């Protein structure tokens, strides 16, 4: 491809709203243009990269035995009402009405549609197992689209759905997809980690995310420094404290604490360590009730763990000060478990405390030297805190370390979550009707492009992993429009490279060499060849790998050997 026949839309300016390097570089390299908040046009250069990623995904899905189909983007409300997600999914579901006042939505995902297909088409166990996938545009009405295509409203996604007769078959399909995902992200040249994850709005009982490791990632990846354990911090289990709780030493005492509203203020006032106090958070229950969650003073609540607790509303909702005062009689800064008039759940670490401090459920007063069972019943105990770096790994091997990650894929074991609600069944070999066991598997194709840039760039621009590069070789002539020899040599080498099967971008513009070099570095083509009069005099071509700082001279006759 010659640049004169291509749409190379590089720019020097960085948009004011572009914070991440990937967003800045995708705009500057001419890959994207913004249409509206969270909506982007993929220009020819960007589309080539997007298609490269989609091709790898498609090849590995086919290799794993999945069958490609294409479902409608617009879905009827009736299917989502059947599954119970029409209201539960929230404001990210863009709802619309047609001219006949029938409800529809733009699909953020396709569990309902594929389950509807399955219940119509699958009748017997003999038709199983099956795995369908599509690569298609999705839409989620993000409350705050940002970071370019990293968190946009419209995006390209690969979503797959497996159907099996029993749980064993579902688990086998899950493992097959898990392995396919590892192959996909390995082939794309990404540094990634598969981690245990919460199932979120999709549902199901078991899930892994595939996280591309990057400092700008929105997710916290937790891993052991001595084992294979890895999880999203939302899912990371805190190891239960070891040993019995020691006996109390001091007598409970009520102290005046005017103006004290936080653990730090209490620690300063009473000269105690934050880890020797507890904090009490009030959340809403399933049926308009309130529930207290109690943690050690130096720990943070894990919202995802909390919203899965029995009796706690999903998604998690915190009570406001008015609700707290009406139920308990004090403000949020004076809460504690002693004589608390609502049910409470205690984190496992907080349950081990002895002689601890807490609010007295009375403004400007706290208790010190409180002990479980002696002064307050312990009640329900659960793991509800966020792990912290340095915690013992849940598998008992090593310590937990943290990294930042960008989620590019997730796999789920759904079981019969959708098939039961939508009555998708098949008849087994004994003639008994059974709900289909499902799995679902997503990859954010457009997000993967941005994540790759976050891992692969420098001050000059993008450094594409070869499988994702829009072109393999950049051919840059020096003063070609003044030198017949340079043009002739370029034409000959260009045709040889094309005939050898390489994707080449020949910069045939009438531009200064520095401009051409800068553009080729910016768009990230892995290999660059420079032909000049002085080089031809010596029978050489200058070769430079994009990821290298140094160029080298290669014999004109042996250029192709560089790439073999």
Swiss-Prot record:
Subunit organization: Homodimer.
UniProt keyword ATP-binding present: yes
HAMAP family named in the record: Pro_tRNA_synth_type1 (MF_01569)
Domain notes: Consists of three domains: the N-terminal catalytic domain, the editing domain and the C-terminal anticodon-binding domain.
EC top class, as a word: ligase
UniProt function note: Catalyzes the attachment of proline to tRNA(Pro) in a two-step reaction: proline is first activated by ATP to form Pro-AMP and then transferred to the acceptor end of tRNA(Pro). As ProRS can inadvertently accommodate and process non-cognate amino acids such as alanine and cysteine, to avoid such errors it has two additional distinct editing activities against alanine. One activity is designated as 'pretransfer' editing and involves the tRNA(Pro)-independent hydrolysis of activated Ala-AMP.
EC assignment: 6.1.1.15
Keyword Membrane carried by entry: no
Keywords, comma-separated and alphabetical: Aminoacyl-tRNA synthetase, ATP-binding, Cytoplasm, Ligase, Nucleotide-binding, Protein biosynthesis
Family: Belongs to the class-II aminoacyl-tRNA synthetase family. ProS type 1 subfamily.
Catalytic activity: tRNA(Pro) + L-proline + ATP = L-prolyl-tRNA(Pro) + AMP + diphosphate
Protein name: Proline--tRNA ligase
PROSITE patterns recorded: AA_TRNA_LIGASE_II
Subcellular localization(s) per the UniProt record: Cytoplasm
Molecular functions per Gene Ontology: aminoacyl-tRNA deacylase activity; ATP binding; proline-tRNA ligase activity
GO CC aspect terms: cytosol
GO biological process: prolyl-tRNA aminoacylation
